[in-house]
Amino acid sequence: IKFTDKSTTRLGERDEEGNLTEESMQRVLKTLKRFKEYCKSNGVNQIVTAATSAVREAPNGRDFLNRVQSDVDIQIELISGSEEARLIYLGVLSGMVLEDKSYVIIDIGGGSTELILADQKDAIALTSSRVGAVRLKNDFFLDSEPINRERSNFLRTFIQGSLEPSIEKIKRRLPKGKTVSMIATSGTAISLGNLILSDLGSQNKRCMVINLKKK
């Protein structure tokens, strides 16, 4: 890894018809132009890009990809939820040394959550659910009302129901008699992990927060 950067574009913002908003698309176009200029100035000859749930589900998603091609001259691959899960698994493999046991990997994104059952050799089950941090915020927290117990219970039930098909698929493929560990990725996972550590103590072995650094 030579360089890392991140830009929050909130592409998952939708209008009343579920389309990507002009403001969010403009933010993405501006970001892609900046990244492309950086690649050009550093001699990069191949740019690999992918679009996930926000573009997959928007009625104007493919129109937006055509716009990127026209305005920025970058071709973005629209990947499925399963392919997104597979790439998350490969990302974990590239950044961590997995032991000879089973792992459940969870990635909480803006519009979807991926659950993966895997080991050090292969991904055994790949799942993707239409529940994510930005989606939940847009659907349930547009007002400024505090989250009371009733609202919290409803949201918990909604999330559990949304994830149930993925969880059942993982459970059916779980190997018997093997230790299973969980790995959570994404910024949401890091924030939750830090909250857990602040409550349990940084020396607690039940939860570790690992920030991968470039070499």
Q: Where are the predicted features?
A:
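Helical "lid/coupling" subdomains associated with nucleotide-phosphate turnover
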Residues: R14-N42, T52-S102, L117-Q120, A125-K215
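Conserved catalytic-loop position in the HRD/HxD motif
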Residues: D107
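Pseudouridine synthases involved in rRNA/tRNA modification
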Residues: T9-R10
